[in-house]
Swiss-Prot record:
Pfam families: DEAD, Helicase_C. Its main location: nucleus. Belongs to the DEAD box helicase family. DDX5/DBP2 subfamily. One of its GO terms (biological process) is endonucleolytic cleavage in ITS1 upstream of 5.8S rRNA from tricistronic rRNA transcript (SSU-rRNA, 5.8S rRNA, LSU-rRNA). This is ATP-dependent RNA helicase DBP3. The gene is DBP3.
Length: 523
């Protein structure tokens, strides 16, 4: 074969390759055009009309805000004529007297239920709640919005009756649609003790209407919990155990239409934020009514609410801008030598837990479990029938101790801060702080175990030089509740440490970023 023939053959091969490439390129382009056309058509169908604008449906469920058309939102609360006819001055006076603030972005302006007579529920539920003299402020204000299917944030002190505030509308919604199966009401709570307490309150309602309720928390075997979950419509759970059961496929939350985050601020403090988000994503945002109850309203809680709630109504009871203690509690603060605290405790028990006061409930707080175990032994040695809940005890022992205290079998309970918030122990007359807690916020939550449900109570606190950095905050709380401030406490100073920034510590300060930097010249 000549050189010319070889060259000619090569040219033909190259030409064929070029033609093939052009064909391939054209084929790919046609395929791409076809796909784009198909996608365009698909997107067109996925668009929803909202007024005059077209809004594209989001792709990611985790970023999707819940729609207002939830299953429970279809229920419509009708305000009674008797409540409507009340003069506005009565409503204004009620709001002022109870320091109530409502942020209602939907402008519904629903009136608070000043009496159970203004509420129309199933007779069995009505009979149960009517055992109380009247709704608590959080119940009175929140019920109309919750019965209307709205999302609600409740900011209120512990012991304000919030369990029935979310429990009564939950059971009422369940009764309106009894055909549904699976878990419909989910309450997430930070601790086993609080979860058990909520369960004890809710089961009173579910038993009345023939519904199943179960409580799920760690520290006990899962087998019985798996069985209970399969037949329950109402579930109270701690985040850790619920997530475990979700990950192993033992629980289905797709039917949940009423979600409650109780003590939301405390759950975030304990590091449950990601767990909570993962749990919420297992529910259907389009049919979920979401409730959040919290004692404080920090940035983290606000962000959680904005992510998973739809135009929530915010109901605040009391002054939530600053830390305040229940004014029905007589606060006594005594500055003592740390070495004499346990001897002083025995003196206080003679004052608050002997003679005519022998049967009055007294709650003693220690700071750490080792201290609690030592004090428990000392009290028993001195003849006191004391129950205890702290970290060294098993879940069964803690539950038994709490039940003994509630029933009156033991009227003296020793606890660490595991029980400082949320535990609803009725008729606690006196709280003794043997060791001051790590924060003034915890102090307020501790003493909030007494003076509940309109009753009065006493909180006696032993304060030492070791806690002097907290003196200023404690003085503010005492002044805010019109309580006497001991001279020995003022000697420690009344300044309060600035709240630390998460990244910059106590050196953080707000800077006006709009100001331009000054030009500095050197001569």
């Amino acid at each position: 074969m000549t050189k010319e023939e070889i060259a000619d053959k090569k040219r033909k091969v190259v030409d064929e390759e070029v033609i093939e490439k052009k064909k391939s390129k054209k084929h790919k382009k046609d395929k791409k055009d076809k796909k784009e056309k198909k996608d365009k058509k698909h997107k067109k169908h996925k668009k929803e009309k909202k007024g005059e604008k077209e809004v594209e449906v989001p792709e990611k469920e985790s970023e999707k805000k819940p729609e207002p058309t939830s299953a429970v939102a279809s229920e419509f609360y009708v305000q009674s004529e008797a409540l409507t006819s009340l003069p506005q001055s009565d409503i204004d006076e009620y709001f002022k007297e109870n320091e109530i603030a409502v942020e209602d972005s939907l402008d519904l302006a629903l009136r608070p239920l000043l009496s159970f007579d203004y509420l129309s529920l199933d007779s069995s539920i009505q009979a149960e709640i009517s055992k109380f003299p009247k709704p608590t402020p959080i119940q009175a204000v929140a019920w109309p919005y919750l019965l209307s299917g709205k999302d609600v944030v409740g900011v209120a002190e512990t012991g304000s009756g919030k369990t029935f505030a979310f429990g009564v509308p939950a059971i009422s919604h369940l009764m309106n649609d009894q055909k549904k199966r699976g878990i419909q009401v989910l309450v997430i709570s930070p601790t086993r003790e609080l979860a058990s307490q909520i369960y004890d309150n809710l089961i009173v309602l579910t038993d009345k209407v023939g519904m199943q309720c179960c409580c799920v928390y760690g520290g006990v075997p899962k087998d019985e919990q798996r069985i209970q979950l399969k037949k329950s419509q109402v579930v109270v759970a701690t985040p850790g155990r619920l997530l475990d059961l979700l990950q192993e496929g033992s629980v289905d939350l797709s039917q949940v239409n009423y979600l409650v985050l109780d003590e939301a601020d405390r759950m975030l403090e304990k590091g449950f934020e990601e767990d909570i988000k993962n749990i919420i994503r297992e529910t259907d945002a389009s049919k979920r009514q979401t409730l959040m109850f919290t004692a404080t309203w920090p940035k983290e809680v606000r962000e959680l609410a904005s992510t998973f709630m739809n135009n929530p109504i915010k109901v605040s009871i009391g002054n939530t801008d600053q830390l305040t203690a229940n004014k029905r509690i007589t606060q006594i603060v005594e500055v003592v030598d740390p070495r004499g605290k346990e001897r002083k405790l025995l003196e206080l028990l003679k004052k608050y837990h002997s003679g005519p006061k022998k049967n009055e409930k007294v709650l003693i707080f220690a700071l750490y479990k080792k201290e609690a175990a030592r004090v428990e032994r000392n009290l028993k040695y001195n003849g006191y029938n004391v129950a205890a809940i702290h970290g060294d005890l098993s879940q069964q022992q803690r539950t038994q101790a709490l039940n003994e205290f509630k029933s009156g079998k033991s009227n003296l309970l020793l606890a660490t801060d595991v029980a400082a918030r949320g535990l609803d122990i009725p008729n606690v007359k006196t709280v003794i702080n043997l060791t001051f807690p790590l924060t003034v916020e915890d102090y307020v939550h501790r003493i909030g175990r007494t003076g509940r449900a309109g009753q009065t109570g006493t909180a006696h606190t032993l304060f030492t030089e070791q806690e002097k950095h907290l003196a200023g905050g404690l003085v503010n709380v005492l002044n805010g509740a019109n309580q006497p401030v001991p001279e020995d406490l003022i000697k420690f100073g009344t300044h309060t440490k600035k709240k630390e920034h998460s990244a910059y510590g106590s050196f953080f300060k707000d800077v006006d970023l709009t100001k331009k930097p000054k030009k500095i010249t050197f001569d």
